[in-house]
Regions:
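Extended alpha-helical targeting/anchoring segments
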Residues: 1-4, 8-329
């Protein structure tokens, strides 16, 4: 097992032969100390209030992305697929400390899954809202997110956008389709008759966008294990499409850059057999003085190319803003 110290960028390995109780108490004390330091007020520099000019470019122009959407809709009309998730990759030149971006991101875009990895020659920072799959005490769960609108500038506008989202036939149909895909994925490793949908199509709000979310659960079969549960769901339908294989072939055709970590998974597997993983979205990869943020939108027959383009920009905005904010620290 391991305990991570993201401030010092260290992982302390805890071996089965160690005094587990003593190690646990030591780590509790260390966590209390870190919390105490985090609660202390700090002074802000004047630079914190100076606008930072950060040029953001994409691997696709607006016209190219919208052309991809139109091509995907042709595949849908031909019966190849029902839905496909098309993304674009945003790029920003920066010398910012990636860990400072992590610090800003967890404040600007609080999410269920927060992570920072330093692989020496590149770093991965993320704040993902979406569970890929978990197995906790024998319960397999996935949490598809499908259906997105930007946050409003006022409460009234925010409420109006939520009403539009929950009553939009296109968004509801897309969400239902991906929930069905999630049920199929969970069902591959679950006991017969145990798969159910909980909290169907609920609203979750984040800093820049509002999503429609559902919970899909089942009881893990006795002859299955958490790794098989992970493999049954990966890649997520909400990042690929339906049917998955054909959707991924179309993604490979239309997207001009490999996705890398985007759409993959980040998580843990414990000695107790539990696993908890998220989808690598709202994530930035730092390498060679550049930050890369990828975001996608689900394309269906009713999709409007310009709206799908704007959805990808809105999804990337929280991460891009964290990079800009970190430059002021």
């Amino acid at each position: 097992s391991a305990a991570s110290d993201v401030y010092k960028r260290q992982i302390q390995n805890i071996h089965k032969g160690d005094n587990i109780k003593q190690k646990y108490e030591e780590l509790e004390d260390k966590a209390e100390l870190i919390l105490h330091k985090m609660e202390r007020p700090v002074s802000l520099s004047k630079d914190r209030f100076t606008p930072v000019k950060t040029e953001v470019t994409s691997n696709l122009t607006k016209e190219q992305y919208e052309a991809n959407v139109k091509k995907a809709k042709e595949y849908i009309k031909d019966g190849d697929i029902f839905q496909v998730v098309l993304s674009q990759r945003f790029e920003v030149e920066t010398d910012v400390d990636p860990f400072d971006v992590y610090r800003c991101l967890r404040t600007l875009n609080p999410s269920p899954y927060l992570y920072f990895f330093d692989f020496i020659d590149y770093q991965v920072v993320g704040a993902s809202p979406e569970k890929l799959v978990s197995v906790l005490n024998g319960i397999v769960a996935t949490k598809p997110i499908a259906g997105t609108v930007p946050r409003g500038k006022t409460k009234e506008e925010d409420d109006m956008l939520v009403r539009q989202l929950v009553n939009d036939p296109k968004e509801r149909a897309e969400h239902t389709m991906l929930v069905d895909l999630g049920r199929n994925d969970v069902g591959k490793v679950s006991k017969f008759g145990t798969v159910e949908v909980k909290n169907f199509m609920t609203v979750e709000k984040y800093s820049k966008v509002t999503h429609l979310v559902s919970d899909v659960q089942g009881e893990l079969r006795d002859d299955e294990n958490p790794i098989n549960a992970l493999m049954s769901v990966l890649p997520a339908g909400t990042l690929s499409g339906a049917p998955k294989v054909r959707a991924m072939e179309i993604i490979d055709e239309l997207e001009n850059k490999k996705r890398g970590v985007y759409g993959g998974t980040v998580g843990y597997l414990g000695f107790d057999g539990n696993i908890d993983t998220c989808i690598a979205i709202r994530t930035v990869v730092f390498k060679d003085g550049k930050g890369y943020v990828q975001a996608g939108a689900g394309i269906v027959n009713d999709s409007v190319p310009e709206k799908e383009f704007m959805e990808t920009k809105n999804k990337a905005l929280a991460v891009v803003n964290a990079v800009k904010e970190a430059a002021r620290l």
